[in-house]
Amino acid sequence: MPRAPRCRAVRALLRASYRQVLPLAAFVRRLRPQGHRLVRRGDPAAFRALVAQCLVCVPWDAQPPPAAPSFRQVSCLKELVARVVQRLCERGARNVLAFGFTLLAGARGGPPVAFTTSVRSYLPNTVTDTLRGSGAWGLLLHRVGDDVLTHLLSRCALYLLVPPTCAYQVCGPPLYDLRAAAAAARRPTRQVGGTRAGFGLPRPASSNGGHGEAEGLLEARAQGARRRRSSARGRLPPAKRPRRGLEPGRDLEGQVARSPPRVVTPTRDAAEAKSRKGDVPGPCRLFPGGERGVGSASWRLSPSEGEPGAGACAETKRFLYCSGGGEQLRRSFLLCSLPPSLAGARTLVETIFLDSKPGPPGAPRRPRRLPARYWQMRPLFRKLLGNHARSPYGALLRAHCPLPASAPRAGPDHQKCPGVGGCPSERPAAAPEGEANSGRLVQLLRQHSSPWQVYGLLRACLRRLVPAGLWGSRHNERRFLRNVKKLLSLGKHGRLSQQELTWKMKVQDCAWLRASPGARCVPAAEHRQREAVLGRFLHWLMGAYVVELLRSFFYVTETTFQKNRLFFFRKRIWSQLQRLGVRQHLDRVRLRELSEAEVRQHQEARPALLTSRLRFVPKPGGLRPIVNVGCVEGAPAPPRDKKVQHLSSRVKTLFAVLNYERARRPGLLGASVLGMDDIHRAWRAFVLPLRARGPAPPLYFVKVDVVGAYDALPQDKLAEVIANVLQPQENTYCVRHCAMVRTARGRMRKSFKRHVSTFSDFQPYLRQLVEHLQAMGSLRDAVVIEQSCSLNEPGSSLFNLFLHLVRSHVIRIGGRSYIQCQGIPQGSILSTLLCSFCYGDMENKLFPGVQQDGVLLRLVDDFLLVTPHLTRARDFLRTLVRGVPEYGCQVNLRKTVVNFPVEPGALGGAAPLQLPAHCLFPWCGLLLDTRTLEVHGDHSSYARTSIRASLTFTQGFKPGRNMRRKLLAVLQLKCHGLFLDLQVNSLQTVFTNVYKIFLLQAYRFHACVLQLPFSQPVRSSPAFFLQVIADTASRGYALLKARNAGASLGARGAAGLFPSEAAQWLCLHAFLLKLARHRVTYSRLLGALRTARARLHRQLPGPTRAALEAAADPALTADFKTILD
């Protein structure tokens, strides 16, 4: 029998997801009688390969195999497979074998599939078709019989390995639906950058991959628990409370508190008990629910619907982009709908603590007995409701976030409505109608409220709302207000966890949490119950009340110039900004307003129409319109509506087909580059032959930016270009929907892709497709699951869908609907590709020979021409500056840059920015040396911005581990081959690029440290942070070697072009430059870093030291001095 492929990553992934993973022969050996051989002499090679490559995976909830299987074949293979498919469809089970099959729906379903009575096929399933027509599977049925093969197909999951590294699923629940076992997260991960322990920095004394002890210290502070070592084996002493920290013998990946529910079996319990000696038994929870003495399970503590998960108390995305509604609380808000009485207080208590949803006013309610703990809370919460009814929210808003005297008067939408929380009208001066110039916009943009003003408003509202008895002490009140301040300082993707909210809150100060009066010894279970009740109250206060205040009084948004930092505009200010922005947008883009009859017609249209909503993002000189695509006209719930899902699926199919044509005929895109990889390939292909020909001639650079590229594309011309791409009357496509599952950093990662082909290159069998993708280098260490396969996707149908999307695009602005008559929506996944196709067609027609001896690149709408011919450079510039109306191309002269003189009057009086002949030429975040053609990174975009606002990492239960992961993931993105390629760049340039990458990484490191929860000081676990710095250097050097594969960079004794010691020195020097500015924070790190740098300095040869010191010249990093962190 042939040897089974290793496929180690795939086998590890399957072992983490199933109870048992066995080779097919081993599984059958357990069931077969003595002397029964599965593989015999003379068997076909296909059958031997099937047995060697097939893995049997037993799910955790699988039924046991037949007790005494007969090993007798009764049915043919097609009949058995059909019978299994019918049973799966009748059970409604999700099984890869039954994908594409469903039960007949009356007489309209057509004839049933052969050997079935009520199953029809609505999509091809190539895996099932291959199985039931395979001679090898037929021989397997003959050897094992009906009982065993039926059990394998219906109760187990079968995978076929495809060498060298992949596999595909044959049957069983799809792998992407399974949740990996808790052991998968605890599986140790390989250290980055090889097995090096760092560069002489002290390592934590831990067995968890080098940084477990520090992580444990970070965890211990988060939990308020002390960690003790009871023996050399690291066992934990008995604890009263469930521990939530890192357990001895576990990797940093172990997230016990979030391990999924699992089916407990004796086999699994024994295996886990054997592998985790010394662990605290059972999963630990933060706030174990359940009220002792309450007889009904309906009163259990559980997260209420619509709230964030247990790990997130408040997320900034919940109060972003909330326009309209006036500066008042919604009438439907819970506090506004309840009277300040004991009955209202009871409803409030039930909603906050017992997951009860208040019904509509006046609706009869069935009274339920309230537990004693919650019954005695009613007077306090009645007082809270009374405080809310008496709170002058309008006066508080005016006092803490005042409007300037010149602010415009609010329109009718902002008049105070009857009810609690309204904001009375103020008396700002009215703005003249029709004033929409940029000066007015800039004036309004400066009138945002600072986070400190917003915090003052929230603090005043909370102090008026919450009675002192609910806080219990001033300490608890100050802790909560500190978290409110932190919520306002988070970025666009920030979140505040439940653990941060309850940290350092004193439960014993809150007398209202007690189930009965009296001071006596509090059992551990009772204390945990009080923690849970207090946590629910704080969760509601922050996640409902504070968030509602922000949603009601402010429009919160990010900007284009401050990354993810949030800005707070009062609703009255933003309404004026939005009106000016809409007026400018209507002047710039051709929109036709729809009548009410046309709106109803579009809502009932088939196929469904995409509807976009327009919002604006502030930029330095005005507002940038952003179109959010994804809604369907008339759909009640966009994410779940079937019309939305169907249309979204069709759009993704069109996107996959356009990408297929782009890859098959790259000339259609002209000079388009779709990312850094494309830029690297094109620039390398231009630079290396040019240098090989001898001394490079003077080169002329032209950078041109197009104004409003997406909004200016003529729809008729775009339709002509896409018709040439799709050739709808000729092409028919085959689209295969596949899921790819792999492991990355110890976690299961899944992606869903569409593989497009035509009949000329179609791979009929999934095995062939997996082999093809591996040969192309686009698939590795993954399991492929085929979801569906469409063999007849007409090009005409896809072209009609494209016309439908472009010419029937509805935009909602305010309460009105418009049809876009020119351009395409920017928020669609198709936008970039459509723009690239259109401009590619323009380049092929207008500039067919411009790339001779030069290169033309275009990233969407940013052109770059490099040519040794001055005449061609001037002709190219002149053509684009005059504009190309046929393609809607109009140049923004303020962003046009050249490095040669432009004759006066040659461009009609306009003059672009002229740089010296030899300079660092800027283009799309790059700095190109106009003489040597070397590439540097352009970091000017970081000027006067906060790294902390732009870098967000999910802190969770393991903030240190997540910080390290985030930093290394960002480092991998920034270490691109374009900057590290030693064939394109000189060694000195690579030294400089590496140093700047490490210096920016040091800024990110500091930003992450500032974001660590629970006020974690660096001095508490310096070994962990030193290891993060060591990992940064080793990962950076590993990426450098990967970007220069085949080159010899270093040797023993710090010899070679770029030894690892040089990368370590650059990393240490960059971190010391940044961390030394914060001596108090990093006092425990600076000494070790300086010692390690000095040791490396002695090891490096003199020429290398001189080159490194030149790369670290402070003059080269002047841009970093303006970063705000």
Swiss-Prot record:
Listed EC numbers: 2.7.7.49
Annotated localization: Nucleus, Nucleolus; Nucleus, Nucleoplasm; Nucleus; Chromosome, Telomere
Pfam family, one: Telomerase_RBD
Enzyme class per UniProt: transferase
Keyword Cytoplasm carried by entry: yes
Cellular component terms per the entry's GO annotation: chromosome, telomeric region; cytoplasm; nucleolus; PML body; telomerase catalytic core complex; telomerase holoenzyme complex
Segments of this protein annotated with the region CTE: 929-1125
SMART domains membership: Telomerase_RBD
Bias kind Basic residues: ranges: 224-243
Basic and acidic residues bias (residue ranges): 244-253, 269-279
Region of interest: RNA-interacting domain 1: 1-234
SUPFAM superfamilies in the cross-refs: DNA/RNA polymerases
InterPro entries noted in UniProt: DNA/RNA_pol_sf, RT_dom, Telomerase_RBD, Telomerase_RT, TERT_C
BP term (GO), one: telomere maintenance via telomerase
Domain (Reverse transcriptase) ranges: 598-928
Region (QFP motif) location: 364-514
Domain comment (free text): The primer grip sequence in the RT domain is required for telomerase activity and for stable association with short telomeric primers.
Quaternary structure and interacting proteins, as annotated: Catalytic component of the telomerase holoenzyme complex composed of one molecule of TERT, one molecule of WRAP53/TCAB1, two molecules of H/ACA ribonucleoprotein complex subunits DKC1, NOP10, NHP2 and GAR1, and a telomerase RNA template component (TERC). The telomerase holoenzyme complex is associated with TEP1, SMG6/EST1A and POT1. The molecular chaperone HSP90/P23 complex is required for correct assembly and stabilization of the active telomerase. Interacts directly with HSP90A and PTGES3.
Entry similarity comment: Belongs to the reverse transcriptase family. Telomerase subfamily.
Annotated protein name in UniProt: Telomerase reverse transcriptase
Species of provenance: Bos taurus
Lineage: Eukaryota, Metazoa, Chordata, Craniata, Vertebrata
Gene, per the UniProt record: TERT
